Amino acid sequence: MAILEEKAAVIPPGGMAVAGRLDRSVRSRLGEICAGRGASLLVLGEDLSLLEDPREPVFDLYTPWSLYTNLRLTVLGHYQRGNAAVAIGAAEAFVGGPLDRAQVRSALLAVRVPGRLEVISDRPLCILDGAHNPAGMAEMVRSLDYLLDRRRVLGVVSILRDKGALEMLNSLSPRCDILFVTQNSNPRSYPADELANLAEGLENKPKVFLDADPRSALRSAYKLATSNQVVLVTGSLYLVADIKRSLESHPRP
């Protein structure tokens, strides 16, 4: 709730707030804040509605101002559709009316989100995703279910101390054959050995390998990955940044 209070501080009196899907308590509190400031509130799932099949590439969006059909994103991740819906709703609120449908379609096709289900190689298939809290990890894993079907994961993982590491590992581990536990460059990163101890205590734990050097951990994952496995770097945007920097001069780990 503290995060909500911080973000809601920017809502101006008499303005409008646009939000994604919210749990009941957060939705209630945001409604109270907006009412207290005389601000309007649009919420995905209430005022903004996605008409979609997660396995299909196109989706439609209903807003208070318009209907946008045959929308398509090139970025991976089912949750990105919700992000797109909120962005469209916010743009409509800003201009006070509907947007040009052709321009909306074109803009969505041009969206790029580095570090979010970003594919950096295909042999083996390697994906970077900066999911860095329990909700983000759970959403990312749901996206993997759609994208990868039954393919198993070799996870290269590092998590910050204050981000709910155990809950994140519990979400990720059922998809993994191996977890390569490492450590990112942020001082708040879990030391690799402590994070590995958490992983070893999981109820349905995969094999756990400890390697405090992210590039070395990724190299090990590449070596062990079979054609039916996917290498996934996740748990922290700092880890994703560390890996991307290390690959700038040497594209293969």
Language-model-derived ranges and their functions:
Residues 1-70, 84, 88-102:
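Acidic, Mg2+-coordinating active-site environments of NTP-dependent enzymes
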Residues 2, 64-178:
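Nucleotide phosphate-binding/pyrophosphate-handling subdomain across enzymes
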Residues 20-42, 53, 58, 125-127, ...:
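C-terminal helical cap/extension that packs against the catalytic core
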Residues 236:
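Active-site-proximal loop/hinge segments that shape catalytic or ion-binding/gating pockets
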Residues 94-95, 144, 199, 203, ...:
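Active-site catalytic pocket residues across diverse enzymes, especially alpha/beta-hydrolases
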